Curated annotation (Swiss-Prot):
This is Fluoride-specific ion channel FluC. Its main location: membrane. Fluoride-specific ion channel. Important for reducing fluoride concentration in the cell, thus reducing its toxicity. Signal peptide: none annotated. It comes from Methylococcus capsulatus (strain ATCC 33009 / NCIMB 11132 / Bath). The gene is fluC. NCBIfam families: crcB. Na(+) binds at G76, T79.
């Protein structure tokens, strides 16, 4: 069997399972009144496509089999345009025209923005402009932010199950937790002496910490739902 085909099949299986777990976890938490799960899947997948395509093709020049497994297999199965189309059609047919239009607008704008941000961050990393953020204390700080976000998401899901706050209040709590993680990360970078030179590095630190907070908070929520 062609090695690239095997790599694509393996990556595709992992991507499909990841999409199933993440989207179902989000739908179980937020409900199915709006396609939150598919939107998150496509936006996060677009970011990873932009970031990893630059890193794997332009910077490290990995073998075709590795690129095929990740970019074609995993991300191809993880993201889903067909589900986005079906969910949007369902919203139109049930008369939720505003939700359908909002889903189209958010999906197009956020996915394009995410793939651009991912590609730009990867290119800046390649020329060393964000090296200070992931070297020395910066790496430990971002690692701690990821761990704290995971624990916060897990604890929040358990608290939500007991308190019964409702989707709106739960969303506000998660936005507040995300803000705390981002602010705490930036403060820790400054306190430990990590040099943020120029607007791009400051913006890069904000983007990385916000992305890490959202991803690991969501992962904690999904894990807690699965454990429950």
């Amino acid at each position: 069997m062609n090695l690239s085909l095997f790599a694509i099949a393996l990556g595709g299986a992992a991507g499909a399972l990841a999409r199933f777990w993440v989207s179902n976890g989000l739908y179980g938490w937020l409900g199915r009144d709006f396609p939150h799960g598919t939107l998150f899947i496509n936006v996060s997948g677009s970011f990873l496509m932009g970031f990893l395509s630059v890193m794997m093709i332009q910077r490290f020049a990995l073998a075709a089999e590795y690129r095929a497994a990740v970019l074609v297999g995993f991300l191809g199965a993880y993201t889903t345009f067909s589900t986005f189309s079906l969910e949007t059609l369902a919203l139109f047919e049930e008369g939720s025209l505003l939700k359908a239009a909002l889903n189209v607008l958010l999906s197009v704008v956020l996915c394009l923005a995410a793939v651009w941000v991912g590609a730009v961050l990867a290119r800046r990393l390649a020329v060393g402009e964000i090296a200070a953020l992931v070297g020395g204390p910066g790496l430990r700080i971002f690692g701690a932010a990821c761990g704290m976000s995971l624990l916060a998401g897990f604890a929040a899901a358990l608290a939500f199950a007991r308190a019964g706050l409702g989707p709106q209040l739960e969303s506000l709590v998660l936005v507040a937790l995300t803000g705390l993680v981002v602010v705490g990360t930036l403060v820790a970078l400054v306190v430990t002496g990590t040099e943020l030179r120029g607007a791009f590095q400051l913006w890069g630190a904000f983007t990385l910490s916000a992305f890490a907070a959202v991803v690991f908070l969501s992962l904690g929520l999904v894990l807690a739902r699965g454990a429950g």
